[in-house]
């Protein structure tokens, strides 16, 4: 499960090679919905496989499936379009420059060795974006862990509560496609800030509703959970936005480091929410934590420098 976090390091680098800067949000929006499609499919397929093979052999079956995908990717995927004689999608014809020299090549020319990790660690945006992503993940994980529990704890059966995730999953796919393309037209950090603020407001609304309604109705619960889930489709913009703060040679290292920093929030979210729920006896307080985390991360996102500014500064210093 933890290996899924590798995408934070890999996808931004691949997308930046295959898509022109003004199409990277669109490119990322084509990739990230795959997880939501898989979740919807597995909701039907996984129980059938487990019932037929047992849970232990089901893991073996899925392992074989993943191995097949690995071989397929190794045989068919390419690092960049130039390997196939192509230009990045969206790049004007005849304007695609030759690949930028690698850091090692620059080092030979300048007489000094350059470490991508050192370059990334010295950039303020790495820690700024890492702080944002850690706080965001704290709220995100607190929400995902308690969507269903917030309904079952208020009298709804498990199947009814779980259906809210299906609705949210479909809306998330749509959101990822829309905001990914919109981020190609507007500053990505602003898109991130706006979407995260929406998550915070919706979470606060859901918490207030649960705390002030002795017997919550089905439709309002579906409404809040589905829209909170949909607003997390901003992950498309987060991944493409993080990658644009680095040049091609440092991009995987930079986004990988940001993805590592966010582990703090991923583990703290469910833990803190669980402690608060045990202390108060009400699941609604999990969404109070979500709201606070999202509003804080919203301000952190808006305070980020523009990607073009960071790139220009990096180029001037190197």
PLM region descriptions:
Residues 188-241:
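C-terminal transmembrane helical hairpin of 12-TM major facilitator-type secondary transporters
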């Amino acid at each position: 499960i933890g290996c899924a976090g590798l995408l934070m390091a890999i996808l931004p680098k691949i997308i930046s090679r295959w898509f022109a800067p003004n199409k990277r949000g669109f490119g990322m929006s084509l990739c990230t919905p795959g997880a939501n499609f898989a979740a919807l499919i597995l909701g039907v397929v996984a129980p059938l496989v487990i019932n037929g093979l047992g849970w232990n052999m089901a893991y073996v079956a899925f392992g074989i499936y993943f191995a097949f995908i690995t071989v397929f990717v190794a045989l068919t995927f390419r690092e960049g379009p130039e390997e196939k004689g192509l230009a990045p999608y969206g790049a004007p014809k005849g304007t695609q420059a030759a690949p930028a020299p690698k850091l090692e090549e620059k080092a030979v020319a300048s007489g000094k060795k350059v470490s991508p990790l050192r370059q990334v660690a010295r950039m303020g945006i790495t820690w700024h974006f890492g702080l944002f992503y850690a706080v965001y993940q704290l709220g995100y994980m607190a929400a995902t862990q308690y969507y269903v529990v917030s309904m079952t704890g208020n009298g709804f059966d498990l199947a009814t509560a779980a259906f809210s995730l299906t609705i949210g999953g479909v809306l998330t796919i749509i959101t990822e496609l829309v905001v990914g393309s919109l981020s190609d037209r507007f500053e990505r950090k602003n898109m991130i800030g706006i979407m995260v603020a929406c998550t915070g407001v919706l979470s606060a609304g859901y918490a207030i509703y649960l705390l002030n309604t002795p017997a919550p109705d089905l439709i309002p619960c579906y409404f809040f959970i589905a829209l909170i889930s949909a607003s997390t489709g901003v992950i498309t913009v987060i991944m493409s936005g993080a990658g644009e703060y680095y040049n091609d040679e440092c991009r995987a290292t930079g986004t990988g480091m940001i993805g590592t920093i966010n582990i703090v929030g991923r583990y703290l979210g469910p833990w803190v929410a669980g402690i608060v729920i045990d202390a108060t006896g009400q699941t609604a307080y999990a969404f109070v934590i979500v709201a606070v985390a999202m509003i804080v991360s919203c301000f952190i996102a808006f305070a980020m420098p523009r990607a073009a500014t960071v790139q220009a500064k990096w180029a001037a210093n190197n």
